[in-house]
Amino acid sequence: MKSPILDSFSFMGGMLLKEIIPKNSVVESYFLYSGEIEIDLCSKERLVISHTSKYPTYEFWWMAKNQPRRIASMAESIFPGLSIEMLYRFQENWHKQRDPVYRAALFYILNRCSKENQVSSGALDRRRLSPITTSRFKKLSINNFHVILDKSQDLYTRINNNIKSDIRLFPVGDFGLNMLDAGSEGSYEQEYINHQQLYDTLSAEKFNWVVLYKYHKKVIQRYKDYNIIMVDKYGNQTTQQDNCEDIIVTNF
């Protein structure tokens, strides 16, 4: 089962990740956005509980899990009448629309049309959203997937204020140096991630955790005391940084 939402992460190490996380594991995932990694895990006999502090993202995924046909049908109905100019305007105010089904449909449409796979940003191309994709969305079935809205944005509070799980998963994506001390709150749909705070928080915890990054030499340096698996563009493990696309870090 594939996620209806695209992610700029484009994580290649799915097979390796499933070797690390055993079947029947309870996995708590943080920084939910596209659900690509989480849905892949839950469709392979793992229970995934995904956390986000962004209400629009929580709302979309709650509805996508419980009413996928309703959202997809709404998107199918409104998309033909949305000009490219209207879509650009909706990038700025989609989250202010009153109808939650309409908001969820816009979340889906804008993400699929954005060349950056974002909802609130990116150059738009209507041709990126195909009827086949929307038809598949109607059939989305993710029974082993649950989404939780975290009231706190403090990472330490969030990871110490939830159920007991076997593994905590942190799909981060890009390591943005300019985000370290910028104080940015991210976008309406994606969380701001302070990389230093994440490292400091995980270093102090005893539970099993997995962190996923796109390749950056700073990630290798920062997590040098932990288990690092480098993944090439084919999804295979590599020992060569020149061939590395993604990084999997574990403390177990």
Where are these regions (language model features)?
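SAM-dependent nucleic-acid methyltransferase catalytic core
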Residues: 1-15, 20-23, 68-183, 244
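Conserved class I S-adenosyl-L-methionine
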Residues: 23-33
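Short, polar loop motifs at secondary-structure junctions
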Residues: 32-36, 132-136, 213-217
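Conserved SAM-binding loop of SAM-dependent methyltransferases across substrates and taxa
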Residues: 34-46
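Conserved SAM-binding motif I beta-strand of class I
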Residues: 47-52
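Short alpha-helix immediately C-terminal to the canonical SAM-binding loop
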Residues: 58
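Conserved SAM-binding loop
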Residues: 61
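Long, positively charged, glycine-interspersed low-complexity recognition regions
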Residues: 188-252
